């Protein structure tokens, strides 16, 4: 079975590359537009550092230094921010429910990563699925990777225990936060958590229950709130059925 999965994963990687190449002109256009939108958003919200200078905007708190200390550095000058102020973790649902659109998701991941990188934002791309009771988080592109080719290795299989995947991503950010102090997690999801492994009995669920439906959504929402309490910003790109749109909002 493992050999068969490896062979299927390699075939899917080839299909992902072929799909992106076939639609290269469209994807390039989307990257350019998205890059411009991200750059404009950064400019609007950017808080540039100000350094002491001999020209620029007069600093009232330093004016006294000119006559008393013969110090002409009584101005503030905007200084370009060379270091990124935040990182982005892009998390792709790689469960079997995504089998029908693997090439599209791989292309979306590449487009988002390329656009963010073009704006100087460090980005890491990971995928997740659950196999035989284990949730697997796979890093396709790390912060230090210049190449985006690893995203072509996106491959869907198994289930999606979203809550556990979100918790694992939080642990990954804690272990390897990247080169910036603030962090944004973007989840590409159909908002339909589902796993074959049942939830074990607990005081709230004496008989246990299936992981899916409202329980799965509540579990994922609770993990999102926990990440937010830890200082991470969490956003979602919804790509599921209209019937699940309300769950995505939760």
List PLM regions with ranges.
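Acidic/polar low-complexity segments with low predicted structural confidence
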Residues: 1-85
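Von Willebrand factor
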Residues: 64-65, 80-140, 143-188, 193, 218-221, 226-228, 235-239
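Generic recognition of flexible, low-complexity loop/linker segments
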Residues: 74-79, 94-95, 99-101, 111-114, ...
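Extended, charge-rich low-complexity regions and/or helical-solenoid scaffolds
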Residues: 82-92, 114, 124, 173-201, ...
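Alpha-helix N-cap/helix-initiation motif
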Residues: 97-106, 154-162, 209, 213-216
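Acidic, Ser/Thr-rich peripheral helices and adjacent loops at domain boundaries
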Residues: 136-153, 204-214, 250
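VWA/integrin I-like adhesion module and closely mimicked acidic/polar interface patches used
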Residues: 191-249
